[in-house]
Amino acid sequence: YAFAENVRVLAPSPQRVTPRCPHFGPGQCGGCHFQHIDYAAQPGYKRDVVIDQLRRIGGFSDPPVRPTVASPDAWAYRYHATFQVDAAGNLCFVGTDNATLIPIDECHILRPELRDLLAELNFEDVQGLTRVRVQAGSAGDLMLVLSTADDQAPELEVTMPVSVNLLLSDNEPVNLIGASTVSYMVRGRPFRVTAGGFFQVNLPQAEALVGLVLEALDLHGEETVLDLYAGVGLFTAFLAERAALVTSVES
């Protein structure tokens, strides 16, 4: 296969739309890949990508890939995102070349409270900062998770209601200001996630994933289940209600 870059659109598809994000496109932010496609058509294209890779790389002649489950929200669904910090203190995503840092001043897939937070952040005079994770909980609680080159806490002035944590190079969190966790509610069950912990970025889709897993397993209370790479135990919590034993493993 080869990599290609669009030079000119001769006849646009009816499914082609104008990308909402000013950072979308060749040579720009590498985070999103389908903003030029109407969202109603995106699930089908994403399924085609999976089928193509299973055939081309995996060697499957007719892979049984089910239809993609669309998100109820095409925009403003991400509850957290991690930015790289360039030498000027700009918050950046990695570009389409997987190397260049692209400064980002707005991101339309972030939750509104995170977009508001992003607009207020200024790290121009903060030394040694390498990464910044912005995170929101179900109830709107906000957290910044900072990473530095030397694992030392940077000097900050915080004038907004946000907790701040430092994530060390060994992935251990150090609480600096406010809470050390954010909270999420999935299918009526609360989850607390520490700085650096993994949780699904799209809560409605997380609920859909749990439902699909439970439906597919069809547990009757006598089974032993392994939840591998379990994160904070999103699936484990619901599996444990239905199986005899659930073993949760995280790297």
Q: Can you name each region flagged by the protein language model?
A:
Residues 1-251:
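Accessory RNA-recognition modules of RNA-modification enzymes
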